[in-house]
């Protein structure tokens, strides 16, 4: 009975469980499908909205983009800059990354894709398919679609994480992360500062804090914080017609590999960065007839509201000085300067709006100014440019103008200039920086076009300035002497500047494509191929393309410059004095004198082992590269022996030294001499001397010639039987230290940016050490002959020199 009851109970239990499993859930029947949020549910009345390229909505701590559907597929340029940094990281404003992006709608997501224009082929060619297959657009970020816009013509996405998370292309550059050993983003100390929308761009600012095991030395937090600015700029629907680059005319350019060309290799094409200056349709006939016309759209620069009023007109003058160059291109009033509207006139005007190019005045101790620009990578069209003008650039200008012209120019004799004088200097730098913003790089070869003595002529310099290009680092006229009355002291927009602007900007109406323009562009270059004033030269191994130099003969120019420095030094106390102030200005300007002297030594020493570089094409006669003549190299070595290695005692002015330091002059002169000594005994320079002899034989200034001349100059006392003073003893020991370096070290790896400026050599498999040993053996014999006829200090010094020589000779294997 009991068993039957148990059986009955179990049967009923199983039956009830089975029936329960088959019965539908009442709860599931009553559950409603999840309702999708509407635009109004997400973008509430509390939202802060900024209308522009995308409408931006901020709801509490969340940011949303409302993207008009017509903008999907359009290409946009993302420019990432470091806006603000902590001390030790470098100053803000520097461009870190640029990428072309495309917003794509894919099912229920929005994709932000990276577009590359580095490799292309015409879409009408079969090879285009291969290019597309190898040029897949990676996805930078993916967003969920939150809702449609109110009128269903736009799409809403949340972008908070795009800027609050560590999206590397939009943050601190990967290359610099390694140096500071950054491990991760510290999200608790990172946040979005602002996102603002303008008609053609969106500006996002966010503070990023990174955990770092090797932060700048002044950081005690174990982190690095900086403010990042991302500019997303809508690119034109129709790219501007390109103009192809030619190395004979200096220009900022970009390159692209075109697989669609009818050649048997992949070929890189370079094209200019330049503003879109076009002739109005109604003015085309006037233009063809040689009349100047106003372009469809002018280049306009606004002067930052923060700029001190007294400097504004000079900044404007520097901008509009370029009008004369654009007239060569056929345009009048092509570039103009304006004050921005007041806040009352236009409360929405902002320097961050990409439609406006602005000279930004930055309250910073940095002695600098720069002129970067943003351009369309598809065509090179410059879209916008802001000149960063740091307040302390005036200190730099004062120092240059003082040390280079005070000997002949009363206006420069002081540590504070009249406003008119400083204004002229500001105008000069303004014009230089504007040159960068219209596409022109530095032309370091410009100043060597003028004969040195022409720079002492008032007639010549008033007509031509001090250099054919304001884009050279020609600075001010240090060659002019006190008797040269009325001579110009600084460059203007010159012959080369007009030539380059004409070449880069003058429209060629009959040319439909960039390729069609090439014949005309080549002719414009060939028309002036024999004119040094029209030459472009980039800094490198070419001694005629140097920074801070003037004239066609570095020796002669430097001799004039040193004469002026010798005039300045005795007057430094008087020209820097001010009652109630200490001697810090005296110390600064004395340091400037030594720096200027070092520049002269660099100008001359660059000729030793120097090679001239004159860009040419196949249809032009003559070599591209030519070694500096033997006679001139020897002249340069003699100059260095006389002016530098023979102690420059004119620097040793006790009336200055006893006011600025308790010690240091012996080390200062040693440092000045050893800097140039090490430059002369540079592996690359020595390798070029060897190659010069191999190619040109007896007409070359050889490595043995140079080393012999150097030894005889530095060890002159051995042959004249004079006492060796402390300055010369220091120099001679520096010489032996450098020879020891040559005998034991190899040339370091050459960074990619320097490969066009440095000659590579395997030192142990060259004649360099052979010649160095030969010089040491000769020197050893000469010391033995001389030391017994010397005073006690000289004898002790020569004993030390002999010990060093022996150590070098029996040192490491060679």
Language-model segments: residues:
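Bacterial Sec-dependent N-terminal signal peptides
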Residues: 1-25
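Soluble non-cytosolic domains of exported or imported proteins
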Residues: 66, 70, 94, 266, ...
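Zn2+-dependent metallopeptidase catalytic core
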Residues: 72, 310-334
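Auxiliary tRNA-acceptor-end handling modules of aminoacyl-tRNA synthetases
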Residues: 23-63, 67-307, 325, 329, ...
